């Protein structure tokens, strides 16, 4: 990935997070899908995220690249809604990924508290 692509991904997530947070704050369920989803509660947001994860897996196994890309975008969108509803930003996720960088997946998993 080029530095430009890396920046574009970060910019896209930053913009998405800002829009989601603004719509959550506005709380206009009649005008905003984000607000209407949030009005149904965290459980509904989590359920929708699970549905999108399943659709992403199915697309990966049975559909074309465009379908997988679309489902991945839906998954990231709904994850952003859930994170924002919990008050967690993509900066926290990026910090956790940076912390794990260079650590073996097996070692990282073994170091987690039970």
Task: State where each predicted segment sits.
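Flexible "arm" and connector segments at domain edges
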Residues: 1-71, 76-114
């Amino acid at each position: 990935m080029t530095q430009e692509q890396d920046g574009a991904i970060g910019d896209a997530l930053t913009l998405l997070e800002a829009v989601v947070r603004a719509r959550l704050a506005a709380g206009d369920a009649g005008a905003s899908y984000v607000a209407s989803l949030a009005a149904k509660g965290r459980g509904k947001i989590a359920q929708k995220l699970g549905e999108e994860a399943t659709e992403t897996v199915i697309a990966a196994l049975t559909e074309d690249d465009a379908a997988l890309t679309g489902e991945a975008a839906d998954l990231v969108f709904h994850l952003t809604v859930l994170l924002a509803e919990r008050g967690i930003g993509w900066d926290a996720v990026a910090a956790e990924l940076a912390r794990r960088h260079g650590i073996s997946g097996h070692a990282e998993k073994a170091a987690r508290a039970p």
